[in-house]
Amino acid sequence: MRNSAASRSTAPAARARPTDVWVDLASPSHPFFFKALTDAVPDIRTTVTARNKTQTVSLAREVGFEFRTVGRDYEQSVLRMLGIPLRTAQLGIEMPDVDVAVGARNAMCVLAAKARGVPSIHYTDNDICAHMDGLYADALYHRLVAQATHNVVPEAFRTEVLTDRGADPDSVHTYDGFKEDVYVAAFEPDDSFPERLPFDGEPFVVVRPEALQATYVEADTIAPELLTALTDRGINVVYLPRTDDYRAFMEDADPDRVYAPQDALSGLELSWHARCVLTGSGTMAREAARMDTPAVSFFPSEHLSVDQTLIDRGDIYHSRDPVEIAEYVDSLTPADARPRLDRARRVREEVASLTRDLIDAETGEDR
């Protein structure tokens, strides 16, 4: 179902009270997404819960959410499987008294809201089941989130992933853009950020290796060869290892040209100021591409539809050949990296307007 922001009213009628919305943050990307979105949706009052998973809680605090922590993630796979239904039950018991629930790639929120008779709006861009067989956990996830009252997805998303698993086609709503646009739109770049890097103001690129532990990755890393190929060409690299084990990948690279920070750096600041962003997964490449910063993906498996769309458009360059990638980066000029935010802001406005309309449809408000 295509929902055009242009076809919706932009002048809401006065409401008797703000709409109470429950926001559940289940993963580290959620605080940025939902802070940017809820700030753009008029006349709502949020109650926020957060799952204690990696940096989710600290990032929720960083963006300014007031929240309550409910449930946690577990390192062991067996405990992780038990943790999800346990947290779903916790949410069903403890969820606040609200008009609407919202979550992103979050079956726990959808099921808890359904159990309490509260309509839910779910946001996702992950249609991996359309591209890879045998991902039974992902197939189950899509079957569960198909039960949301509404699913909001990018136009590039394969909607049959949801409709084939029980979602009413009229409950799946698309927007002209990408999930990353929503929070990129709220980004305010810091002109002094490059001063935190040891490159004396010289251009740099960002390299983030593959997530080798992910179930969908069945390839060896090219990060060591890529780092060497880049630094051999005199290219400065900010290298973002996923764990300390990944630091070994930089051993053969020129130590004067590669910097692996001990403390976390803002990914959006890096994307804004970089000559190019190179990553073995999807999010950072999409963030950079939506800013108009050159982006390279060396993702080793099947792409999500959102990634393939950006590759097909030429917004992301994809290769698994380290030398080929280094040659591409070396060919870039300053004119190729002119980041902007106007496109992302248009998309955030569209998603916020769509969200407000869906809330109104569920609460009986007229616009």
Q: Model-derived features: where do they sit?
A:
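A nucleotide-sugar donor-handling region in carbohydrate enzymes
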Residues: 2, 148-219
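Catalytic donor nucleotide-activated moiety binding site of glycosyltransferases and closely related
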Residues: 53, 63-74, 207-209, 227-261
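A donor-sugar binding/catalytic signature common to diverse glycosyltransferases
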Residues: 101-112, 122, 270-307
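Haloarchaeal acidic low-complexity proteome signature biased toward cell-envelope/secretome components but also
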Residues: 1-21, 60, 193-197, 339-367
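Donor nucleotide-activated moiety binding/catalytic core segment of transferases
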Residues: 82-91, 244-284
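Conserved nucleotide-sugar phosphate-binding/catalytic loop shared by glycosyltransferases and other
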Residues: 25, 42-83
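A conserved, positively charged/aromatic
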Residues: 122, 129-153, 271
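Catalytic binding pocket for nucleotide-activated donors in carbohydrate/polymer assembly enzymes
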Residues: 290-331
